[in-house]
Curated annotation (Swiss-Prot):
Main location group: cytoplasm
Record's protein name: Nucleoid-associated protein SYNW0027
Any one annotated GO CC term: bacterial nucleoid
GO function term, MF aspect, one: DNA binding
Organism lineage string: Bacteria, Bacillati, Cyanobacteriota, Cyanophyceae, Synechococcales
Keyword DNA-binding: yes
InterPro entries membership: YbaB-like_sf (IPR036894), YbaB/EbfC (IPR004401)
Species per Swiss-Prot/TrEMBL record: Parasynechococcus marenigrum (strain WH8102)
Compartments reported by the entry: Cytoplasm, Nucleoid
C-alpha cells in the first residue's frame, strides 16, 4: 500500500548499507592514518617535524647549525615545521575521509566546512 509518508524502503536500505560500509572501513582508515608519517619542514629546511595522519607527533629533527643560530630562530623554525606538518596531515585526513564517505557531506567536526 502506497502513501502514509513512509520513505522508499529501497533507498532506506541502500543508505543503511552505505552507512555499514563506512563503519567497516573506518577502522581500516584509522589504522592507515596512524601508520602514516607526514613531514613538515621549516622554510629554510633546517627543522623537520613528523606527524601521523591523525596529527600525533612522531619526531623532530633539527639541523645542528639551526641549534647554534639561537633560541628564537630555532623556535621559529620548529613552529614553521610543525605548522607545515599539521596542514599536510589535516589535508590528508580530510581527503581520506571524503573518499571513505563517498562525498556524503557529513560535516564532521574538525574537518572544515
Amino acid at each position: 500500500m502506497a502513501g502514509f509518508g513512509l520513505p522508499n524502503f529501497g533507498q532506506l536500505t541502500e543508505a543503511f548499507k552505505k552507512a555499514q560500509e563506512i563503519q567497516q572501513n573506518a577502522q581500516a582508515l584509522q589504522d592507515e592514518l596512524d601508520g602514516m608519517e607526514i613531514e613538515g619542514k621549516s622554510a629554510d629546511g633546517r627543522a623537520s617535524v613528523w606527524l601521523s595522519g591523525n596529527q600525533q607527533p612522531l619526531r623532530v629533527r633539527l639541523d645542528p647549525e639551526l641549534l647554534s643560530a639561537g633560541q628564537e630562530t630555532c623556535e621559529a623554525a620548529t613552529l614553521e615545521a610543525l605548522q607545515a606538518a599539521y596542514e599536510q596531515s589535516t589535508a590528508t585526513m580530510k581527503g581520506r575521509m571524503e573518499e571513505l564517505t563517498g562525498g556524503l557531506n557529513l560535516n564532521l567536526p574538525g574537518m572544515g566546512g
